[in-house]
Amino acid sequence: MGWLFYTDRRIKSYADEKAEITRLCTFEGDTRKTELVKACKVASTWYAAARVTNLDGTAVEDTTYVTDADGSITFGAVFLTRYDDGSWGYKDMEESAGPVESRAPLSLLALLSELKDPDSYAHAWRQRCQDWAAIPDYEEGDKIRLAAPVTLTDGSTCQIVTATHYKRGRQKRRCYRIEETGGLVRLSKASLADSELLSSAKGAASPVLAEYLAGRN
């Protein structure tokens, strides 16, 4: 399915978007109904968990999902969204289609029914979400070794950096100080995958933690 835009511009806010995602995930047919369990927005993408139940109370049988104890199944859905000239639009995909966007929170993944096929697109999508969630959020002063050198716009590279910040107006923005040059660089979360904590700012104030980290290096 392609993009669908609401040219009446009735979607204007986060609350409007969430209400529309809820509506899109809530419907009833002749034999089944679907209802939203949880929705989370990450950047411009909405992730949803939707539960399917049979109207007659019997267990839902599905080729992709293991039926839950209450007879329902809960699947994941992804809604790409954007605004075009003031009009909000979306493109939706069910997890079994293997969406590229894979940053669903672990709290949402925990609501989904088990999958029958461990080699399915849905299983691979869930694993990508888990891998993303596993990337650490470093704290101010943490010294880090990236899994691979990052090439900067001037052609130089960096691999050992320290988490710090810079200010833009009243806001603090995360950046990293390069070990070799002292320069500052902004890094995407993806570039921190498989990185290693060399020393922690907390370790300086905690002899026990400092000893633990020293033993790892």
What annotation goes with each model-predicted range?
Residues 86-133, 175-217:
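Intrinsically disordered, low-complexity, charged/polar segments
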Residues 31-45, 122-125, 131, 141-145:
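Short glycine-rich, low-complexity/disordered patches
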Residues 23-82, 150-167:
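Amphipathic, interaction-prone secondary-structure segments
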Residues 14-18, 32-36, 59, 73, ...:
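Short amphipathic alpha-helical segments that mediate assembly, nucleic-acid/protein binding
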Residues 136-150:
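Short coil-to-beta transition motif at edge beta-strands of beta-rich domains
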Residues 46-48, 142, 172-176:
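Short beta-strand micro-motifs in enzyme catalytic cores
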Residues 1-31:
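Charged, amphipathic alpha-helical stretches
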Residues 153-190:
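Basic/aromatic-rich interaction segments and small domains that mediate binding to polyanionic partners
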